[in-house]
Amino acid sequence: MISQNIIKIIQKSNKRYFSSSNELKKTALNELHKELGAKMVPFCGWEMPVQYPAGVMKEHLHVRKESGLFDVSHMGQLRIHGKDRVKFFESIVVADLQALPTGHSKLSVFTNEKGGIIDDTMITNAGDSLYVVVNAGCADKDISHINEKIKEFKSVNPTHDVSMQLLEDLSLIAIQGPTTESILQKFVKDQDITNMEFMTQRPMTIAGIDCIVTRCGYTGEDGFEISVPSKQAVRLAELFLATSNASIESGIKPAGLGARDSLRLEAGLCLYGHDLNDDITPIEASLNWLISKRRREEGGFPGASIIQKQLQKDGCPQKRVGVIINGAPAREGCLILDPSTNQEIGKVTSGTISPITRQSISMAYVKTPFSKIGTQVNVSIRGKPITATISKMPFVPTNYKKL
C-alpha cells in the first residue's frame, strides 16, 4: 500500500515536474537501472527509476537499516569561479558564504524580490570556486537566473570577476544509510573517512576513480553524494551494488524516487514544488536557520526587507509544520481545518504513511497561531474531517555523522 501511494504522489501530485516528451534525458546509469528491473518514469524531463523489484517499502527500510544507492545525476552541478564569486553569490542566496570554511558545505535558497524561494541549493566552498548543486526540476530556471544575475552584477562594475561553469560531464551518486561509511571505506585506501564531518567535501579516489565526495544527503541518514565522471559512473555504481545481492540483507541496494520521497518526508526535508515555491519565504518555510545573524542584519539578497520583517515577532503569517493524522494519509492539497470553527487554516503539501512509525505523516502550512507543536487540528480527507496534531519534525530521529 505504501509503495503504491508514494508512486501515485510522485506521478500525480505536481505534474509540472513531469515530462510526457519522447525526448527524455537519460543519466549515465539509465541502462543499469533497467538491467536491475527498475520501473522507469518521466521526472523533470529525465527518465528515472521510481522503484526496483523489491518495492518502495523494502528500499526505504534498507536505507534506514543498511545502505541504499540513489542516482541523482539529474540534478544540476555547477561551479562559480572568479575572485568576486562570494560577493556575487551572496547577492542571490541567503547564505553567509564569507564564513563558510574551505571544504565545507551549506544548504541555502535562492530568493526573489518578494522573498519567495526560487530553489533550494547546496553550496560548497571548494577553495578556488563554489561548487553548487541545484534541483533537477529547477535546473534550467536556476541556470538562467544565475546567468542573468551575473550580467547585472558585471553591469554595475565591469571589473567584477565571476563566471559560471556547467559540469555536464559529471554524474552524481548518493549512497545513504548507517553502514555506508564502513562500506565506502573499503574502496578508499589513501584516507580515513571516519573523521570526515557532516556537510564537508573532499577529493577522494574510490576504487581508482577520482571523485569529489560530500558527506550529506536527503534521507536523514549518514551518507555521501559522489560527483563522478559520467564515463566511470556505471563502474562505480556496480562496485557499490556488488556489496549486496538478492540473498543477503546487508550491503548497498538500489533505491528509487519513491523511497527517496518517503525518506525525506520522515526526515522533515522539503521538496521544491511541493513544500517550497516562489511564493513561500524561508521564514514561512521554517528555514530561519539558513540565515545567519550577519545576513539578517545586513540583508543584501533579494527580498531581504520582507524576510527581515517576517523575522520579527508576529511578522510571519504562516508556518511550515509537521502533522500526524489519526487515519489515512493526507495528500497534497488537503485542507487543514480549525476544529472549533471548521474554517480553513492551512493546506497539506506532502504526505504518506511512515514506514518506520506506521503513522500518517504530513507537512503542511498553517496560519501561525495554529503552528505550535501539540495543537489539535482537523484534516479534510475525501471531504471528511480527520483529527490530527501539529508535530515536531523530523518525524523519526536523524542519524547524521557526529564527530
Swiss-Prot record:
Q: Where is the transit peptide?
A: 1-25
Q: Which Pfam families match?
A: GCV_T, GCV_T_C
Q: Does the keyword Transferase apply?
A: yes
Tell me yes or no: is RNA-binding among this UniProt entry's keywords: no
- For this protein, what reaction is catalysed? N(6)-[(R)-S(8)-aminomethyldihydrolipoyl]-L-lysyl-[protein] + (6S)-5,6,7,8-tetrahydrofolate = N(6)-[(R)-dihydrolipoyl]-L-lysyl-[protein] + (6R)-5,10-methylene-5,6,7,8-tetrahydrofolate + NH4(+)
The record's subcellular location field reads: Mitochondrion
Alphabetically list the UniProt keywords. Answer: Aminotransferase, Mitochondrion, Transferase, Transit peptide
The record's listing under InterPro entries reads:
GCS_T (IPR006223), GCST_C (IPR013977), GCV_T_N (IPR006222), GcvT/YgfZ/DmdA (IPR028896), GcvT/YgfZ_C (IPR029043), TrmE/GcvT_dom1 (IPR027266)
Cysteines engaged in disulfide bonds, as pairs: none
Q: Which GO terms describe its biological process?
A: glycine catabolic process
Q: Where does substrate bind?
A: 225, 260, 400
| EC number(s) from the headed UniProt entry | 2.1.2.10
Q: Which GO terms describe its molecular function?
A: aminomethyltransferase activity; transaminase activity
GO CC list:
glycine cleavage complex; mitochondrion
Location (main, coarse): mitochondrion
* Annotated family: Belongs to the GcvT family.
* Assembly information from the UniProt record: The glycine cleavage system is composed of four proteins: P, T, L and H.
- Which purpose does this protein serve, as stated in its record? The glycine cleavage system catalyzes the degradation of glycine.
Name the record gives this protein: Aminomethyltransferase, mitochondrial
The taxonomy runs: Eukaryota, Amoebozoa, Evosea, Eumycetozoa, Dictyostelia
